[in-house]
A protein has these predicted regions:
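Amphipathic alpha-helical assembly/interaction segments
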Residues: 1-88
């Protein structure tokens, strides 16, 4: 399960990096950020599973889930205001 959480979390960063490299193309930028958001949601799934199966305490789960949600808020802001990130 650790591998799945790590893979999904790393994929969030990889997709953001790819989006940044293509930021001059709004549709591609949004698409890659949307992929990152999907991976971020997968992280939540694995966190819920880890807590359910006893691999995380409630405190650990709460901390990690809040961090995941903060990443989601940042991604949402970037997706909804892509013009703020375009090359001029």
């Amino acid at each position: 399960m650790t591998d799945q959480i790590r893979r999904a979390a790393r994929s969030v960063g990889a997709n953001i990096s790819e989006a940044w490299g293509k930021r001059r193309y709004e549709a591609h930028f949004i698409s890659k950020l949307t992929d990152a958001d999907g991976e971020n949601h997968e992280v939540e799934h694995w966190l819920i599973t880890a807590r359910r199966d006893g691999y995380l305490t409630d405190a650990e789960f709460t901390t990690l889930l809040e961090q995941k949600r903060e990443v989601g808020r940042m991604l949402g802001s970037m997706i909804h205001k892509p013009e703020s990130f375009h090359l001029k």
